[in-house]
Amino acid sequence: SCGYPCSHCGIPGCYPG
């Protein structure tokens, strides 16, 4: 989890949390 939306993560398969 990135802790922010995938659209801001830039990493495929990522999710908020």
From Swiss-Prot:
The keyword Cell inner membrane does not apply. The modification Glycine amide is found at residue 17. Keywords: Amidation, Disulfide bond, Neurotoxin, Secreted, Toxin. It is found in: Secreted. GO terms for cellular component: extracellular region. Expressed by the venom duct. Contains 2 disulfide bonds. It comes from the Eukaryota. Disulfide bonds: none annotated. GO terms for molecular function: toxin activity. Its main location: secreted. The cysteine framework is XIV (C-C-C-C). May have neurotoxic activities. Does not show any effect on voltage-gated potassium channels (10 uM of toxin tested), and on nicotinic acetylcholine receptors (5 uM of toxin tested). Does not show antibacterial activity on both Gram-negative and Gram-positive bacteria. Negative results: does not show effect on Kv1.1, Kv1.2, Kv1.3, Kv1.4, Kv1.5, and Kv1.6. Does not show effect on muscular (alpha-1-beta-1-delta-epsilon) and neuronal alpha-7, alpha-4-beta-4, and alpha-3-beta-4 nAChRs. This is Conotoxin Asi14a.
